[in-house]
From Swiss-Prot:
Pathway assignment: Purine metabolism; 7-cyano-7-deazaguanine biosynthesis
Protein name according to UniProt: 7-cyano-7-deazaguanine synthase
Gene name of the encoded protein: queC
Keyword hit for Nucleus: no
EC number: 6.3.4.20
Keywords: ATP-binding, Ligase, Metal-binding, Nucleotide-binding, Queuosine biosynthesis, Zinc
Biological source species: Gluconobacter oxydans (strain 621H) (Gluconobacter suboxydans)
Length: 242
């Protein structure tokens, strides 16, 4: 089987980071497909946001519409059933005994990327794009650069492929992620992702803030709000640095 050197598969949850990664991929590759996962997450509303974002991205420019390919959703309910975490159970968000946030789903990104690689092999895609980062993240060990590099080696050895795992957000924070969004598509794309992506762990799409929708109190909302505030402060029109 010949793997296309210019086809990408984006892990696309419907959140800010993965939406930015989708725009990044559409700016670089000839064909881009997306994959999302249903794993019993409390914020399953993000899966509904995926379709809206894909439609908006396709309408963003003729080039992006031509490049955007098929969407895939994979059922990983067993992952949620195994995980006693605040993302998959009705539990108060806090720290676990090991010091990690109890929103950490053990092995989630490793499993996501493994399934993505299996799908990429079937879809003849060499490039796999994920929005993990270790700049202003929650301490999840499967978001670290070392983990992703090790996994790339493992997947290529185990599947006899030459996949490239791309992490365009690995070394930038949430404010810089908005900068990247603006660089990719101007204020129009910033507004699109602000309005239609979802970050809130509580699945709240009823309360709208200047940074997007969410409960405004969970760690994901706090991180997004802080990133938006710093992004706005850095813009010349708001008196920040150029």
């Amino acid at each position: 089987m010949t793997i296309s050197s210019n086809t990408a598969l984006v892990l696309f949850s419907g959140g800010q980071d993965s939406a930015t990664c989708l725009a990044w991929a559409l700016s670089r590759f000839d064909r881009v497909e997306t994959v999302g996962y249903a794993y019993g997450q409390r914020h399953a509303i993000e899966l509904e946001c995926r379709e809206t974002l894909r439609n908006e991205m396709a309408a963003f420019s003729p080039d992006w519409k031509a490049r955007l390919g098929e969407d895939h959703t994979i059922d990983l309910a067993s992952l949620g059933a195994l995980s006693e975490t605040a993302l998959t159970r009705e539990a108060e968000i806090g720290l676990s005994e090991n010091g990690l946030p109890n929103t950490f789903v053990p092995g989630r990104n490793i499993i996501f990327l493994t399934f993505a690689a299996a799908l990429a092999a079937r879809r003849n895609a060499r490039h796999i794009v994920t929005g993990v980062c270790e700049t202003d993240y929650s301490g999840y060990p499967d978001c670290r650069d070392d983990t992703i590099k090790a996994l790339q080696v493992t997947l290529n050895l185990g599947m006899d492929q030459r996949f490239v795992l791309h992490t365009p957000l690995m070394w930038i924070d949430k404010a810089q992620t908005w900068d990247l969004t603006e660089e990719l598509g101007g204020q129009k794309l910033v507004n699109l992702i602000n309005r239609d992506s979802h970050s809130c762990y509580m699945g709240d799409r009823t309360h709208q803030h200047d940074w997007g929708y969410g409960c405004g109190t969970c760690p994901a909302c706090n991180l997004r709000a802080d990133g938006w505030r710093r992004y706005q402060q850095s813009r010349p029109s708001h008196g920040g640095a150029a």
